[in-house]
Amino acid sequence: MQETWRWFGPNDSISLQKIAQAGATGIVSSLHHVPTGALWQLEEIEAQKKIIEDAGLEWSVIESIPVHNDIKTRTGNFQEYIENYKQSVINAGKAGVKTICYNFMPVVDWTRTNLSYRLPNASQALRFEMTDFAAYDVYLLQRENAAADYSEEVLNRAKARFDAMDETEKDLLEKNIIAGLPGGEGSYTRDTIREAIQQFIDLGTEGFRNHMFEFLREIIPAAESVGVKMCIHPDDPPFSLFGLPRVVSTADDARKLLNAVPSPSNGLTLCAGSYGARGDNDLVGMAKEFGDRIYFVHLRNVKREPDGSFYEADHLDGDNDMVGLVNALLCEERRRHAAGETNCAIPMRPDHGHLMADELNLPDVKPGYSYTGRMKGLAELRGVIHALEVLQRQHAL
């Protein structure tokens, strides 16, 4: 597997030199200054690629070219945005960046309620707390019919939690949920998010899924023309929020997507932390079933709770079988090599890391994207990968 690292461009406080020192050889990045829906110019892609290569690294994966909401609803200027997207994919391929991660989540990108959840060792993790989310949805946002989406037990806890919050706590919860997170596509106010939510609720799950398929039928031929692999990121978390349709949450969702557009350029990002937030997603089984269409991997672990809450655990200490998953992915790489395929190594990034050590005192660390926490996770995963590779070679002899 290729060890990669998410870099937020030239303004990232974590330099490419530091990334190389952490042991990564590949960079996962985007043109973060380009507005959602706008065309990625070939010259800009090449310029950022040169910055990365001058540091001795490779731009392995684009994460991401955001999909405009007009495309998701097929309203407004969606056709113009699709044409821009197609040309952006072509330009990326011409520049030599052949893997593009994207998502099709409606309204909100990855969502957490607590960005500084304290762990027993005093480091901090990201957490999704169902009680807090329901408190926001039902009692602060006051979304129409929101209460119908939660159990009586959750509603009772949410009401008690809401009543105990002061205005500062309410503002922080709202900021965490709807104000946008690293890699997100924008921020909302309370009024604008209500309007956006209703638009997607009216569309419904199957209507939204069909819009995703229509998008892929237009984008994938462009990707094929330049040898680009598109790999969709799952919903995070992988269940409905705000009553919104979610169509990349389960193995069955992935199966439908791959079957709808059966092209080698239509693939998956296997995000262990996202899919793994559902106990009914068998990550090892998914790696085996979809292996030949997995082009990018996020290795992150979670500790799940019965009501849907979870927090991001140490990479090797959550509810997901990280060793089994890595083993399945290494077996897929060996299969590709035996079949004579080129570029068999699957790009992997350690995804989020805990906030710890000196970074606890820094004011500008992006939630989930600490240097020390990710370096720790990458080192742990590197040890697993090395041990499994040795065992696989010994078994093959």
From Swiss-Prot:
Keyword annotations from UniProtKB, A to Z: Iron, Lyase, Manganese
Enzyme class: lyase
GO molecular function terms attached to this record: ferrous iron binding; manganese ion binding; mannonate dehydratase activity
Cofactor: Fe(2+); Mn(2+)
InterPro entries assigned: Man_deHydtase, Xyl_isomerase-like_sf
Keyword Transmembrane appears in the UniProt entry: no
Known EC number: 4.2.1.8
GO BP term, example: D-glucuronate catabolic process
Catalysis: reaction(s): D-mannonate = 2-dehydro-3-deoxy-D-gluconate + H2O
One Pfam family named in its UniProt record: UxuA
Family the entry assigns: Belongs to the mannonate dehydratase family.
Function text: Catalyzes the dehydration of D-mannonate.
This protein's name: Mannonate dehydratase
Organism annotation: Saccharophagus degradans (strain 2-40 / ATCC 43961 / DSM 17024)
